[in-house]
């Protein structure tokens, strides 16, 4: 076999299958278009809808090199030659086209003829009941029977993913590395009986069955092929090395780690593990952040944070005490950037996010490790409450706590960890959402089967309809008089709250009555329910009515919805492609947009975004709406949210040259109708997620009027011109600070400060205050010594559930007493720390309830 680089292997695979009639598709995102998955874990994930029969394939033959991420075995990464978080999966797929024979023959052809792998180095396994696969390997390929292992369902049968679904046998191809590890004495080594010698390099899955609820298999009308081969394993094979970490995919990264840490690779096994962990994790970190995932305490962000913190801890084991991971990003980008240009485009952003996260974690890690050691010293073990405290207070992910415990040989019991986690999250979760849905709307069973409300609100703000169902107190009724009820009409122009856009409001009128529409929602797919209040007359089932949407409210909402799309586009342009929508609210009076970004926007960035949006508004660009297939929409570059469900036909809202999104909301027909766009706030929602609130149209005008009124009031109160207001306010602020200081010192100086005389004649002046900030205590201590001339001053203040402390020692006592030592002694008792100089020191603590004990034993702390 000739040596081949990773680039050559990747290119050879794709070219080979292109010649076999496959469409070569680029790698999909690591963030799948699938709400059931956090990450793309295999090459087949982007094609799940096709395998599941939900979508018709555009191409029947496809080949890809897919970037993937898995953390299920993260504790093994670095300890074995082939476990990884981020990896690349080569794969060829057939959707109802070729099947077993071609899949096996082409895999063999690629391995033996393109890569030049000696046939004697290859073994295979097949499902024990799959005679067809056995026959192809034996008769078509010519592989001897002894090199075809028949294995059970656990080893050679894939799926289904749940209790039911597509599934089928598979065949695995193994490469014999030649290493005689774990082979039984007197027996020939095979993939079934050796440990580590044979490496699985390719898995060919034959999806030919559907498993029903009873576990029975039924032949599928359309059979599919799904194959996966790890590029990292191919590289190890073609580069003549046993470990994936010795390939050209990892060596440049490992070299960079050696430079930064000063630790040589392959000099010490424990340190080698740490180097491998960092090398692996840096690939995952770089790709995740470049795709807009940021460290946080939930979902993808939590997984990223775990990976970063695990890499950091191994850096600490190599002697690193400052942020350093961000300095490895360029090595990853240099190696992988030609194939995945997104990591080059996002390189500076990745470094910035990573550096900030490293700094944040280092501040808490040292304290967390001290607490870990204290718990172990006291209890000899870690329990669920301890593990949660380490996570919640000190930022140690549970997995990291478990790993540290294993290394130290400490027993861990975390059975109740999730209970503590759930309790913490309880208040922030809308935990009753699913229960509410299941409990309510039973009255919908009264509707005709397959009933759908006809929505006419894209074209009309007024329409005629018929009352199909009336419900009160969760039960269907025949009529309603002066009541608040929920009503289903045959058709409606009212938009139901969905996709972040609030519902329409308006009126319903009939021959002798009228009602207000207060809220509209979709209770089940296609069934729109109107929550109304009958003002006059009696509304009856079967009644013909006229439904009128509040025109001004709808138009204001439309302005804000289109502006939200423009804002999304502007944020991507100003901040980068990593920006993704993380939530929104579109109301008539304002819009709110949550998005992924790693830090607050500067004033300059906010102005850039505002200017861009207003430029697009001024250009009066026609807004286009069209319906197309989901596949065509995605191919055209449309922005879709992975959390949303889309049908076969989707609605695309496009502002040509600016924005293109899948959206079911209502929009203006021309950007000029928005009028004016103004950002009113920008803030953090959670780690890695920012929020912008903005107004448009008449709301902007109202905002400007209110601001003008405020400025006029300030001018009158301060007796200043508009251009003098800033200086005048700053001057007032300084005066207030000075007055507060004087007031605080004056008030405290009047308090009775106790005095105690020591055996050596030295006097100790001490006092405890309420709600006095630490910054004022030093001045009070100065005043005491000015008045008393000599002595030791110890002042404590309970402020915001914490304790602040200052100690001051007069010059004549410095040979006997050290303020820094006294402060540290007291702070330790109060659960804190501190220090300073011999004549003056400051400290803090977390246990104000222990102050009384400190005062009772004051002399002890002076020693």
Swiss-Prot record:
Its EC number is 6.1.1.7. One of its GO terms (molecular function) is alanine-tRNA ligase activity. GO terms for cellular component: cytosol. PROSITE patterns: AA_TRNA_LIGASE_II_ALA (PS50860). Signal peptide: none annotated. Binds 1 zinc ion per subunit. This is Alanine--tRNA ligase. It comes from Thermotoga petrophila (strain ATCC BAA-488 / DSM 13995 / JCM 10881 / RKU-1). The lineage of its organism: Bacteria, Thermotogati, Thermotogota, Thermotogae, Thermotogales. The gene is alaS.
């Amino acid at each position: 076999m000739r040596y081949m680089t990773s680039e050559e292997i990747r290119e050879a695979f794709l070219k080979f299958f292109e010649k076999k009639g496959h469409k070569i598709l680029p790698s999909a995102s690591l963030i799948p278009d699938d709400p059931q998955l956090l990450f793309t874990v295999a090459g087949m994930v982007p094609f799940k809808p096709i395998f599941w029969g939900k979508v018709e394939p555009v191409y029947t033959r496809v080949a890809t090199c897919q970037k993937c991420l898995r953390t299920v075995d993260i504790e093994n990464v670095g300890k074995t030659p082939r476990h990884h978080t981020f990896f690349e999966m080569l794969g060829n797929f057939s959707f109802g086209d070729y099947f077993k024979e071609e899949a096996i023959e082409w895999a063999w052809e690629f391995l033996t003829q393109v890569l030049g792998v000696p046939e004697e180095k290859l073994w295979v396994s097949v499902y024990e009941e799959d005679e067809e696969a056995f026959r192809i390997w034996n008769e078509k390929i010519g592989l001897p029977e002894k090199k075809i292992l028949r294995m059970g369902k656990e080893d050679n049968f894939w799926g289904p993913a749940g209790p039911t679904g597509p599934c089928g046998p598979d065949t695995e191809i193994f490469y014999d590395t030649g290493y005689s590890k774990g082979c039984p004495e007197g027996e020939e080594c095979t993939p079934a009986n050796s440990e580590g010698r044979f490496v699985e390099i390719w898995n060919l899955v034959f999806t030919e069955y559907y498993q029903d609820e009873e576990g029975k298999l039924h032949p599928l009308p359309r059979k599919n092929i799904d194959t996966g081969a790890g590029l990292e394993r191919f590289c190890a094979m073609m580069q003549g090395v046993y470990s994936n970490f010795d390939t050209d995919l990892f060596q440049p990264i490992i070299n960079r780690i050696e430079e930064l840490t000063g630790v040589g690779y392959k000099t010490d096994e424990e340190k080698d593990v740490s180097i491998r962990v960092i090398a692996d994790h840096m690939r995952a970190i770089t790709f995740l952040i470049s795709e807009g995932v940021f460290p946080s305490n939930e979902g993808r962000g939590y997984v990223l944070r775990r990976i970063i913190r695990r890499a950091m801890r191994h850096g600490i084991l190599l002697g690193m005490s400052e942020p350093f991971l961000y300095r490895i990003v360029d090595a990853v980008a240099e190696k992988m950037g030609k194939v995945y240009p997104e990591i080059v485009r996002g390189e500076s952003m990745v470094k910035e996010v990573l550096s900030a996260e490293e700094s944040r974690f280092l501040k808490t890690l040292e304290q967390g490790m001290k607490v870990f050691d204290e718990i172990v010293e006291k209890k000899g073990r870690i329990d669920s409450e301890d593990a949660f405290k380490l996570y919640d207070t000190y930022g140690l992910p549970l997995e990291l706590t478990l790993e540290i415990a294993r290394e130290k040989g400490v027993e861990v019991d975390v059975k109740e960890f999730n209970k503590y986690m759930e309790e913490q999250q309880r208040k922030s979760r809308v935990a009753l959402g699913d229960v509410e849905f299941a409990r309510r709307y039973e009255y919908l069973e009264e509707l005709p089967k397959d009933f759908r409300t006809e929505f006419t609100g894209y074209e009309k703000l007024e329409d005629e309809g018929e009352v199909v169902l009336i419900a009160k107190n969760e039960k269907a009724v025949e009529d309603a008089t002066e009541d608040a009820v929920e009503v289903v009409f045959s058709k409606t122009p009212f938009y139901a709250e969905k996709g972040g856009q609030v519902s329409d409001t308006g009126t319903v009128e009939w021959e002798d009555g009228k009602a207000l529409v207060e809220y509209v929602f979709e209770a089940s797919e296609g069934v729109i329910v109107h929550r109304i209040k009958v003002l006059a007359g009696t509304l009856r089932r079967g009644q013909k009515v006229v439904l009128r949407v509040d025109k001004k409210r709808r138009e204001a909402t439309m302005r804000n919805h289109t502006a939200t799309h423009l804002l999304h586009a502007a944020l991507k342009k100003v901040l980068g492609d990593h920006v993704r929508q993380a939530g929104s609210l579109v109301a008539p009076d304002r819009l709110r947009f949550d998005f992924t970004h790693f830090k607050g926007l500067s004033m300059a960035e906010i102005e850039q975004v505002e200017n861009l949006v207003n430029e697009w508004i001024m250009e009066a660009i026609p807004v286009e709406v069209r319906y197309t297939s989901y596949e065509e929409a995605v191919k055209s570059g449309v922005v879709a949210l992975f959390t949303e469900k889309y049908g076969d036909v989707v609605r695309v809202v496009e502002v040509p040259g600016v924005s293109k999104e899948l959206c079911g909301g209502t929009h203006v027909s021309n950007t000029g109708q928005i009028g004016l766009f103004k950002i009113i706030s920008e803030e953090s929602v959670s780690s890695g997620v920012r929020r912008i609130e903005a107004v448009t149209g008449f709301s902007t005008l109202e905002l400007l009027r209110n601001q003008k009124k405020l400025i006029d009031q300030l001018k009158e109160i301060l007796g200043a011109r508009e251009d003098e207001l800033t200086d005048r306010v700053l001057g007032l602020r300084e005066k207030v600070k000075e007055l507060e200081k004087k007031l605080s010192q004056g008030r405290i100086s009047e308090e009775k400060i106790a005095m105690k005389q020591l055996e050596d004649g030295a006097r100790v002046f001490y006092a405890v205050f309420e709600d006095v900030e630490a910054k004022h205590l030093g001045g009070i201590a100065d005043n005491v010594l000015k008045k008393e001339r000599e002595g030791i001053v110890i002042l404590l203040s309970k402020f915001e559930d914490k304790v602040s402390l200052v100690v001051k020692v007069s010059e004549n006592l410095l040979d006997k007493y050290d303020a820094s030592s006294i402060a540290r002694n007291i702070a330790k008792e109060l659960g804190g720390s501190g220090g300073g100089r011999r004549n003056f020191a400051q400290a803090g603590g977390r246990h104000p309830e222990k102050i009384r004990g400190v005062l009772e034993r004051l002399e002890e702390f002076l020693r």
